[in-house]
Amino acid sequence: MSRKKKPLMSARGKPIRYKVHVKKGDTVQIIAGKDKGKVGEVLKVLPKVSKVIVKDVNIITKHVKPQQEGESGKIVTTEAPIHSSNVMLYSTKQKVASRICYTFTDDGRKVRMLKKTGEVID
């Protein structure tokens, strides 16, 4: 039986939320693991465990038992979470992965920028 791992708790009893450098909808490249080199879109960010779910990356197969009498079992494929340190933001224009930095625009907004290309993300 597999059990879900409980997130770390702070001194006040609240779960710790890690700062994750990617957001939902970002295009990322996998830099470590079995799917190294693949590029995909972030579907979900899990800040309590510092993981992200990327489209068509880290695919697992689950064998599901039949729920009702006449129903047959199924094999379901789904994306599993991958640690946020194993992904890097990807520029679709220049086809290169890069770290990010935070800069301010002329009107004073704080935005994320790719270090290699200088491309502003949001």
From Swiss-Prot:
Q: What is the lineage of its organism?
A: Bacteria, Bacillati, Cyanobacteriota, Cyanophyceae, Oscillatoriophycideae
Q: Which family does it belong to?
A: Belongs to the universal ribosomal protein uL24 family.
The entry lists its GO molecular-function terms as:
rRNA binding; structural constituent of ribosome
CC per GO annotation: ribonucleoprotein complex; ribosome
Q: What is this protein called?
A: Large ribosomal subunit protein uL24
What SMART domains would the database entry show? KOW
What keywords are assigned to this protein?
Ribonucleoprotein, Ribosomal protein, RNA-binding, rRNA-binding
Q: How does it assemble?
A: Part of the 50S ribosomal subunit.
